[in-house]
C-alpha cells in the first residue's frame, strides 16, 4: 500500500511498480476529499452521501486498498468514539457554513474519521492514522497516539485494523503500548526511526 502524496504524486503507480518486485496499490486519503466537499455548497445529506460514495467506490473497485487520515495535524487525535452521533455531522457542517466557531471543524472531522473507520471494516481494509511528528505548524501534543485509545477499543471500532504512522514519535512508548494491548493496532516504523535516536529501536 503506497501513499503517493497530496495534492499530486511525484511518481505514478506504473513508475513505482516498475521499481519494486511487489504489487503497488494507492491508499485513499480522506482530508483532500473533505476539503473538496467543503468548497461545495452541500446540505449535510449531500455531503455525507458524497463522502461515503467516494470512499466506497474507491475501495469496492479495488483501486485503493486502505484509507489514511492526517487528522492529527488538523484538529488532533482526541477523537471521541461518540462522535458518530446522528446530529454531530449535521450541526458541525451547519456551524461551519454559517461561519461559527466553537470547534465545529473538529467535530466534523472527528465524525468523518469515525465513519471512515466504519467503511474500512466494511471493506476489510486497514486504516492508517498519522501520529506524532509532522510539519512545523502542527500541535505536537495533540498528535499523541494515546488520545486514540478510547476510540480504538470502543466496541464499534475495535475490529478495524489500524496502523499508527511514524510510530507516534516522539511518543513511541505510547504507540508501542497500544500495539501491544490492542490486537488489531500496528506500528509503522518506516519514517519515524530515521529521525529518532538509536534508543527508539529498543523501546519499540
Regions inferred by a protein language model and the residue ranges of each:
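Metal-cofactor-binding active-site regions of metalloenzymes
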Residues: 1-109, 113-118, 181-184, 194-195, ...
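Catalytic pocket-lining loop regions of alpha/beta-barrel enzymes
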Residues: 76, 89-204
Amino acid at each position: 500500500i503506497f501513499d503517493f502524496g497530496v495534492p499530486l504524486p511525484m511518481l505514478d503507480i506504473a513508475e513505482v511498480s516498475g521499481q519494486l518486485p511487489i504489487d503497488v496499490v494507492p491508499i485513499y486519503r480522506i482530508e483532500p476529499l473533505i476539503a473538496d466537499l467543503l468548497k461545495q455548497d452541500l446540505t449535510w445529506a449531500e455531503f455525507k452521501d458524497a463522502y461515503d460514495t467516494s470512499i466506497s467506490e474507491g475501495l469496492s473497485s479495488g483501486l485503493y486498498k486502505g484509507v489514511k487520515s492526517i487528522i492529527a495535524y488538523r484538529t488532533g487525535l482526541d477523537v471521541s468514539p461518540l462522535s458518530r452521533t446522528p446530529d454531530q455531522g449535521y450541526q458541525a457542517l451547519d456551524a461551519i457554513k454559517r461561519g461559527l466557531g466553537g470547534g465545529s471543524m473538529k467535530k466534523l472531522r472527528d465524525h468523518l474519521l469515525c465513519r471512515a473507520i466504519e467503511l474500512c471494516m466494511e471493506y476489510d481494509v486497514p486504516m492508517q492514522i498519522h501520529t506524532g511528528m509532522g510539519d512545523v505548524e502542527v500541535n505536537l501534543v495533540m498528535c499523541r497516539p494515546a488520545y486514540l485509545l478510547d476510540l480504538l477499543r470502543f466496541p464499534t471500532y475495535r475490529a478495524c485494523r489500524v496502523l499508527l504512522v511514524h510510530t507516534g514519535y516522539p511518543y513511541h512508548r505510547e504507540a508501542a503500548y497500544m500495539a501491544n494491548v490492542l490486537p488489531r493496532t500496528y506500528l509503522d516504523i518506516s519514517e519515524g526511526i530515521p529521525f529518532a535516536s538509536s534508543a527508539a529501536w529498543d523501546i519499540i
